[in-house]
Amino acid sequence: MSKQRVFIAGHRGMVGSAIRRQLEQRGDVELVLRTRDELNLLDSRAVHDFFASERIDQVYLAAAKVGGIVANNTYPADFIYQNMMIESNIIHAAHQNDVNKLLFLGSSCIYPKLAKQPMAESELLQGTLEPTNEPYAIAKIAGIKLCESYNRQYGRDYRSVMPTNLYGPHDNFHPSNSHVIPALLRRFHEATAQNAPDVVVWGSGTPMREFLHVDDMAAASIHVMELAHEVWLENTQPMLSHINVGTGVDCTIRELAQTIAKVVGYKGRVVFDASKPDGTPRKLLDVTRLHQLGWYHEISLEAGLASTYQWFLENQDRFRG
């Protein structure tokens, strides 16, 4: 039996590289990988020619233009245009070249700013989005709807998963535009090295957030991709939509900061600056559907933070930022 030829779009990113690591351990797939220089995903002709020549069986669509609040506010046109082009080019070229299985990786920012907690898949398009990343979120919603529409019109098997906040190896540790976990890991690391008496964390520490290690995300992605078609249909009708991926467990930012301090070995005080904004009080995905499909996360937050910090220590000379 010939191996399945699997294209991972975005194989150098945090999620794509985690999917690659797990698939490389298997003997039943042949990975097809292209760097940005080798294949410009914004070029529809280049993407079509790639699919026409490579005989791809499955696609993991993990490529995206990503960034923090400042980047989203400064370059909204780039975020909506580039993400919609990447998705449109890959999904359409996959269809034109008879690739029947594809998994699109979205983001929990697709849900309304004031969505009911925990956020079920049915909350999609039920309210106004968070303004700071609306263009990016709309592009991700378009990706879900592209998959859904090619399924409905052409009978394709294009699936979507929506991850919660991710962290792990190959994250962005830039001091000013990274997400909360890499930002705090770096800050506590530097405070420890400098023997700083305290570390100030923005906000009251009371907001609750959910975090998933990227290796768990990769495992969930492969699990969902490999579900029997009938099982997928049963769990995503009537619109063949998407599946949330998370832990179903959240923690306060205070608990997160204290756990990071423990992992890093920081002995000073953790101070919360309540004059700084907190953001949404709670953001948690409803993962009932994922659990019904037989997948549960395996990496605890503390264990995941410890392994991520170890990766940070080993890659300080080359990490992003």
Curated annotation (Swiss-Prot):
Classification via SUPFAM superfamilies: NAD(P)-binding Rossmann-fold domains
Top-level EC class as recorded in UniProt: oxidoreductase
Binding site for substrate: 187, 202, 209, 278
Metabolic or biological pathway, per its Swiss-Prot or TrEMBL entry: Nucleotide-sugar biosynthesis; GDP-L-fucose biosynthesis via de novo pathway; GDP-L-fucose from GDP-alpha-D-mannose: step 2/2; Exopolysaccharide biosynthesis; colanic acid biosynthesis
Keywords annotated in UniProt: Cytoplasm, Isomerase, Multifunctional enzyme, NADP, Oxidoreductase
InterPro entries referenced in this protein's UniProt entry, alphabetically: Epimerase_deHydtase, GDP_fucose/colitose_synth, NAD(P)-bd_dom_sf
Annotated effect of mutating residue 179 to N: Nearly abolishes catalytic activity
Effect of residue 187 to A: Decreases affinity for the substrate GDP-4-keto-6-deoxymannose
Site positions (Lowers pKa of active site Tyr): 140
GO term, biological process aspect, one: colanic acid biosynthetic process
Annotated catalysed reactions: GDP-beta-L-fucose + NADP(+) = GDP-4-dehydro-alpha-D-rhamnose + NADPH + H(+)
Keyword Cell wall biogenesis/degradation: no
Record-stated family: Belongs to the NAD(P)-dependent epimerase/dehydratase family. Fucose synthase subfamily.
PANTHER family membership: GDP-L-FUCOSE SYNTHASE
Function: Catalyzes the two-step NADP-dependent conversion of GDP-4-dehydro-6-deoxy-D-mannose to GDP-fucose, involving an epimerase and a reductase reaction.
Assembly and interaction partners: Homodimer.
Protein name per its UniProtKB record: GDP-L-fucose synthase
Originating species: Escherichia coli (strain K12)
